[in-house]
């Protein structure tokens, strides 16, 4: 009887193991086909998730913008298999953590990946440049199809735009996200930045393949755009994938002519996201062609007067990283804007700009960039407004924005003494009279949207240098605690005690001054930074 039970148990284990292998095989097939939505569901059904299952499940969530789920799966992956996990999973895990709001953990994995210290708070502070800070106010555009993905926006003439969308339900379903393939649309722009009269582009342009990211010449007679190649090509892993090429079409008798693939496109790699310089003499694009810095790089190529092209040039390491640089746009003042997840940023794709020789990339800050993908940025510099795409709401959506330039202004507030004493002799507690003054200061800090608040506190000359230094620091901390208790963020406040080293009068000795004169040095000074909009004077 015991042998019978053992046989039954072994049979059940074998059936279970066979079922597990079958589930993994099914999920792996979907993953290889880049059907990530279905792959995630299939991998979730696997009871005993090994390292490869966790890697692929995490990636399936990551590539479909389910960052909270991705972070949870990658966390389990690293808890179980940290010593054997390839570096690229650190990179994706760190981005998932950033999107999930776990910045300290994200810093840890970014630091491990890049092999250098990463401090997100320091990066945020570095974005504030007193000479060149722009604040963006973004608004999601209303759409008549909330389930579609909309991005790849571009200017089309004076009052029109073009964008890519999955809203055409007559197109084939794309396994990656289970939405229709992309088509190009056009629409009118209102003064408020709203889009209306949205219509499909010509059937000469749109096909059952993906079309996106159009770029138009200034006269509106030439368009460059992305289209997925019909032919699939085996990548280094032996997986058949469809790469992307740039096509060009000319307006003939009021209609778009048959598109032609530009000559440096290929079946073996992608060439995508065209953008024209203001004078139309240079075409910018993204590509993962061999010889770049890694993944997708940005390139430029001369467009000759006869319509032929020069030799593509990589924009170099100031712009390009080992990760993705995509969606270039060149404004009327020849500033290059682009999206990247390889430079340190606020999460996933961020928008950057570069001027001059493209030797440096500058992040546009967190009034524009989110912890998710922000990309396809376009702007009319003179009007200080434009558009971008972002999946910060969970789906690719279009946003309009207005931009204002600010300077950082440092304001100093010193608590008035009059006949009052800031701190009693040898004390650091806040008196009721002083609380009333601090309440007024708090109102100023809140109304000014103050940042980088510093409290510097002082002592009189009575007592040892060491004791007075400690006493002044306690006074600074006491002042800070009062501000924090009344709604000022502790992270915005720093404190420093100067002891008796910075008197406001000549009372530098322990004797020789009146009590009122000594009292003037028992004080706190509060300084803070605030942003002041740059008002441009109208030229006459």
Predicted stretch roles:
Residues 1-24:
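Bacterial Sec-dependent N-terminal signal peptides
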Residues 24-131:
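Alpha-helical protein-protein interaction scaffolds
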Residues 33, 92, 99, 103-419, ...:
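Short, conserved micro-motifs composed of acidic
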Residues 149, 212, 417-421, 426, ...:
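Envelope-exposed proteins and targeting segments
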Residues 340, 345, 456-540:
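Periplasmic OmpA-like peptidoglycan-binding domain that tethers envelope proteins to the cell wall
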Residues 400-452, 513-515, 528-540:
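Periplasmic peptidoglycan-binding/tethering modules of Gram-negative envelope proteins
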């Amino acid at each position: 009887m015991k042998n019978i039970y053992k046989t039954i148990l072994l049979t059940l284990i074998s059936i279970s193991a066979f079922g597990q292998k079958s589930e993994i095989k099914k999920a792996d097939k979907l993953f290889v086909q880049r059907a990530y939505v279905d792959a995630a569901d299939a991998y979730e059904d696997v009871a005993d998730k090994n390292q490869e299952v966790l890697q692929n499940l995490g990636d399936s969530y990551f590539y479909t913008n389910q960052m909270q789920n991705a972070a949870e799966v990658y966390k389990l992956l690293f808890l179980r298999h940290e010593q054997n996990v390839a570096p690229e999973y650190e990179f994706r895990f760190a981005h998932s953590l950033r999107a999930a709001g776990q910045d300290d953990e994200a810093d840890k994995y970014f630091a491990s990946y890049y092999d250098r210290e990463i401090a997100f708070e320091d990066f945020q502070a570095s974005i504030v440049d007193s000479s060149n800070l722009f604040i963006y106010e973004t608004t999601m555009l209303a759409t008549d199809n909330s389930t579609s993905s909309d991005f790849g926006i571009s200017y089309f003439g004076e009052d029109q735009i073009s964008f890519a969308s999955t809203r055409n339900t007559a197109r084939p379903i794309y396994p990656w996200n289970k939405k229709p393939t992309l088509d190009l649309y056009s629409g009118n722009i209102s003064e408020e930045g709203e889009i209306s009269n949205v219509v499909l582009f010509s059937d000469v342009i749109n096909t059952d393949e993906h079309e996106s990211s159009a770029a138009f010449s200034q006269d509106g007679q030439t368009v460059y755009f992305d289209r997925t190649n019909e032919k699939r090509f085996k990548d280094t892993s032996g997986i058949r994938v469809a790469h992307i090429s740039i096509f060009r079409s000319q307006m003939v008798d009021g209609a778009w002519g048959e598109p032609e693939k530009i000559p440096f496109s290929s079946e073996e790699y992608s060439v995508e996201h065209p953008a024209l310089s203001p004078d139309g003499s240079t075409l910018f694009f993204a590509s993962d062609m061999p010889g770049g810095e890694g993944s997708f790089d940005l390139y430029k190529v001369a467009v000759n007067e006869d319509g032929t092209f020069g030799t593509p040039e990589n924009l170099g390491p100031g712009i390009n990283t080992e990760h993705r640089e995509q969606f270039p746009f060149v404004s009327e003042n020849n500033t290059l804007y682009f999206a990247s997840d390889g430079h340190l940023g606020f999460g996933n794709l961020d928008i950057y700009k570069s001027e001059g020789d493209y030797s440096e990339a500058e992040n546009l800050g967190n009034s524009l960039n989110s912890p998710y993908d922000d990309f396809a940025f376009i702007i009319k510099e003179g009007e200080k407004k434009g558009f971008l795409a972002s999946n910060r709401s969970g789906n690719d959506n279009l946003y309009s924005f207005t931009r204002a330039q600010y300077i950082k202004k440092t304001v100093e507030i010193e608590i008035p003494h009059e006949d009052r004493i800031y701190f009693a002799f040898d004390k650091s507690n806040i008196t009721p009279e002083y609380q009333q003054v601090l309440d007024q200061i708090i109102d100023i800090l809140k109304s000014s949207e103050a940042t980088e608040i510093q409290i510097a506190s002082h002592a009189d000359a009575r007592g040892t240098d060491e004791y007075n230094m400690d006493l002044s620091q306690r006074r600074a901390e006491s002042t800070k605690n009062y501000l924090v208790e009344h709604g000022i963020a502790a992270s915005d406040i720093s404190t420093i005690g100067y002891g008796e080293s910075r008197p406001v009068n000549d009372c530098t000795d322990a004797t020789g001054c009146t009590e009122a004169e000594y009292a003037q040095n028992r004080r706190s000074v509060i300084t803070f930074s605030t942003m002041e909009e740059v008002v441009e004077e109208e030229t006459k």
